[in-house]
């Protein structure tokens, strides 16, 4: 079985998202990535997810962990996974340069302490489910019902798409200030919860996951233009092995001390 995704197509999707999203804001990136992936047929969605996993796994080596520690004030297994999601979203050139030497990350506009993008690693899952939900809403007459009840809020199918996307990507956001918007949100959430589709991607992935030959073929294509990673231990002095990134972080720290944190700032 060949996966319906190539490295060039994968990175072209990432580039389209980067051209539209606020790349300092994970929420913005997730929404634009979701919208792009919703356009893909299911086999390409699976391929995109497999390519994402492959690139994320490839970036797992000690010096990259050190870079994550400098940028995010430490790391862990889960936090490092989330950091590599952010890394992928920086695009092919940035990813490749970081694979050559993680110190090259210093050339990027880095949102220090905010590059652990957990949600981006799950967007293929959400997009697959979103496709299923749109079909379900239409087939069961839910879409027509919602359009009748909320004509001021749902003026097109794009508005319903937005409502479903928000419940998938940001289910725990603050309550709406307008009663009608909150009621629409509550109904959309109810229909998603009762659809039985929330975890449909798990079944799809299990039934269609690539075999060893397909994985090997895919990865030989993906990694052909990437450097070979040498086995090494975790560096002891980050400032020595990643001097440019270390200096950039120190400069960022110094700049922050010049101003008091704004009210409500988390970190």
Q: What do these predicted regions represent?
A:
Residues 256-267:
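Non-Sec secretion/translocation targeting segments of pathogen effectors
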Residues 31, 35-114, 170-173:
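Core of folded catalytic or high-affinity ligand/protein-binding domains
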Residues 95-97, 101-242, 246-248:
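Basic, alpha-helical nucleic-acid-binding regions used in initiation and control of genome expression
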Residues 1-42:
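N-terminal leader/targeting peptides and immediately adjacent processing regions
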């Amino acid at each position: 079985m060949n996966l319906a995704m190539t490295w060039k197509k994968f990175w072209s999707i990432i580039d389209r998202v980067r051209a539209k999203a606020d790349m300092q804001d994970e929420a913005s990136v997730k929404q634009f990535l979701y919208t792009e992936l919703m356009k893909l047929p299911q086999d390409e969605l699976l391929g995109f997810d497999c390519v994402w996993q492959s690139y994320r796994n490839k970036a797992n080596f000690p010096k990259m962990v050190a870079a994550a520690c400098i940028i995010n004030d430490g790391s862990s297994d889960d936090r490092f996974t989330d950091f590599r999601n952010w890394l992928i979203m920086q695009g092919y050139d940035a990813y490749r340069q970081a694979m050559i030497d993680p110190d090259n990350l210093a050339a990027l506009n880095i949102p220090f302490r905010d590059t652990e993008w957990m949600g981006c690693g799950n967007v293929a899952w959400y997009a697959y489910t979103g496709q299923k939900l749109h079909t379900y809403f239409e087939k069961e007459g839910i879409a027509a019902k919602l359009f009748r009840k909320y004509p001021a809020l749902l003026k097109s199918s794009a508005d319903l798409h937005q409502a479903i996307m928000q419940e998938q990507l940001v289910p725990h956001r603050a309550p709406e200030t307008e009663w009608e918007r909150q009621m629409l949100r509550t109904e959309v959430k109810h229909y998603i919860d009762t659809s039985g589709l929330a975890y449909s991607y798990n079944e799809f992935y299990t039934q269609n996951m690539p075999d060893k030959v397909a994985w090997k073929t895919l990865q030989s294509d993906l990694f052909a233009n990437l450097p070979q990673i040498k086995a090494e231990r975790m560096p002891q002095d980050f400032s020595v092995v990643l001097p440019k990134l270390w200096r950039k972080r120190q400069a960022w720290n110094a700049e922050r001390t010049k101003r008091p944190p704004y009210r409500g700032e988390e970190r």
